Regions:
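Extracellular glycan-modifying ectodomains
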Residues: 1-215
Length: 215
């Protein structure tokens, strides 16, 4: 755990999700999110959007929307926290022995400006939805594996001794943006993610799979 929050009170650590994740990123549902996190951490990309405002005047990190429930007091505070987070992410990637990643979703919301993937739809936790700026995407097998493959190649380059353990989330979707039953969308999503994981397993000898979905 790279972000333990030892510099703040125990109460704030609990409310701010410190020590919950290996780094304080919240839920990363898609390989595209994981890839863009890596790219930002290592200077390969600079997101067009830095902060979203809330109705209470606080600010939300668009890429970690629920990591700080009380919100940030200013954009500067948010960016200071994000830079510390990215430093922790780099430390994690470079020093971990086994990196476990659960593939969770194929549905996501994406910026039309720079292709950024968000952890939740704009307007749900912060910001506001504008169809000219954001769009829904439901990733295919090809798109899912492409992002996963790009991340794995980059990760292995900086930490060649590390292993990767992939899983597919067993949790079914509770809602879908597709105009169909959520049962159908769940089956599609799990199928895509499972195939992408198998493709990675077959390509990289240092990648393994744990059958959490199957169990």
């Amino acid at each position: 755990v790279t972000e333990k929050g030892g510099h703040i009170s125990e109460q704030r650590r609990a409310s701010g999700n410190y020590g919950v994740f290996s780094a304080r990123y919240g839920n990363i549902y898609t390989p595209s999110q994981l890839l863009q996190l890596y790219q930002e951490a290592y200077g390969e990309r600079i997101p067009a959007e830095r902060a979203w405002s809330r109705a209470d005047g606080k600010f939300v990190d668009p890429y970690r929307q629920q990591i700080q429930p009380e919100g940030f007091n200013s954009v500067d505070d948010l960016m200071e926290d994000r830079l510390a987070h990215l430093k922790a992410v780099r430390h994690l990637f470079e020093n971990v022995d086994v990196f476990v990643f659960t593939l969770g979703l194929t549905e996501a919301w994406r910026s039309r400006e720079d292709g950024s993937i968000f952890s939740a739809a704009p307007g749900v936790v912060g910001g506001s939805y504008d169809s000219s700026r954001y769009g829904f995407v439901n990733f295919s097998v090809e798109q899912t594996f492409e992002a996963l493959n790009k991340f794995l190649i980059r990760f292995h380059a900086i930490n060649p001794g590390a292993k990767v353990l992939l899983t597919v989330s067993p949790v079914p979707l509770i809602a879908t943006y597709e105009p169909r039953s959520v049962l159908v969308s769940t089956t599609y999503s799990k199928s895509v993610l499972r195939v992408a994981a198998e493709m990675a397993l077959n390509k990289f000898p240092w990648v393994d799979y744990f059958p959490s979905y199957e169990i």
